[in-house]
């Protein structure tokens, strides 16, 4: 006889979500559904009608875990709408900011999954390693972008200022010194994850991967014409779940996809492994890739070069697209600027892409492994909330106009 297992909210993630699993007599998941129950904030609606420079400041507050990708995706979208060509040094500083954020965010995830993989006798060493890596990565973001949480120096047209030559040398030396610690930490985490003994094939699915760049992002690799979005009542076969779900379902070429570290490794480094262990391994390896890129940028950066372009902020109504590879995957912001005001704004964020893939990925294994599958995606639900309940009496969701966050 089928039984329903409900985990609400799922734990060790940002925001609130629910995992509903139908299981057979042996406890094996036959149907998995994962959905956001985090309420909408409506930040995209808040920026509509305002001056372009307000958008990055507001939408970076979509989430306290991933403000860097949202800031960068916002300025990239507005740059595109206003046809701004950002100077090379400005582009490098933006990428440096994101590369350091990748290292920091992936280290945070290792803290969240530590109870799953790290034995008690190694817990203190692992957490101290996470803390040291985070401290140094956040220092880079602070120095380059102004603040580690809400970066004030990332601007439309580029960056507020270049860093000094002294700062470049200090950051370069600091990251070179950090490299052995990151290498050691990655080796430790991969070893512990692979030795855990999770079932072979756990979390494997047949959905395609989607990524635009190994570290930063490339709007030319995201085709808006191949993207569609459906409401939850058209996706979930359970009407009650469809009513409660707070995110839309994005599709690429008509299919739900996986975004994130494994997707980037698949698309740009020929990574072949699939499933939960592969996702954790890819995320750990990406820490090394991101750190190496940050060091390369500091070696390449001309601190005397301009970092911001002049531009006319009036705009013509062109739809601009910003595609940024956040730690959790592809973060796409879209903006239209006309007559000096934002006429339209929408964000399509990583966890929104992953939600329809995560639930079915739990199927075929005992339900006790369900949370392992979910945590492998490092979900961020505040970012993923897209649907507003408009009738408290019957819990119906808005149909004709979606609120996208």
UniProtKB/Swiss-Prot annotation:
NCBIfam families listed in its UniProt record: frhA
Residues reported to bind Ni(2+): 63, 66, 380, 383
* Classification via SUPFAM superfamilies: HydB/Nqo4-like
Q: Catalytic activity, per the record?
A: oxidized coenzyme F420-(gamma-L-Glu)(n) + H2 + H(+) = reduced coenzyme F420-(gamma-L-Glu)(n)
- Which leading EC class covers this enzyme? oxidoreductase
How does the annotation summarize its subunit structure? Heterocomplex of the form (alpha(1)beta(1)gamma(1))(8).
MF terms from GO for this chain are: coenzyme F420 hydrogenase activity; ferredoxin hydrogenase activity; flavin adenine dinucleotide binding; iron-sulfur cluster binding; nickel cation binding
Reading the lineage from the top rank, the first entry is Archaea
Record-linked Pfam families: NiFeSe_Hases
Is Oxidoreductase tagged as a keyword?
yes
Q: Which UniProt keywords apply?
A: FAD, Flavoprotein, Metal-binding, Nickel, Oxidoreductase
Family matches, as InterPro entries = Coenz_F420_hydrogenase_asu, Ni-dep_hyd_lsu, Ni-dep_hyd_lsu_Ni_BS, NiFe-Hase_large
Tell me the protein's name.
Coenzyme F420 hydrogenase subunit alpha
Tagged with keyword Oxidoreductase: yes
* Family membership noted in the UniProt record: Belongs to the [NiFe]/[NiFeSe] hydrogenase large subunit family.
Q: What is its EC number?
A: 1.12.98.1
Q: Which cofactor does it need?
A: Ni(2+); iron-sulfur cluster; FAD
List the source organism: Methanothermobacter thermautotrophicus (strain ATCC 29096 / DSM 1053 / JCM 10044 / NBRC 100330 / Delta H)
Instruction: Tell me, in a sentence or two, what this protein's role is.
Output: Reduces the physiological low-potential two-electron acceptor coenzyme F420, and the artificial one-electron acceptor methylviologen.
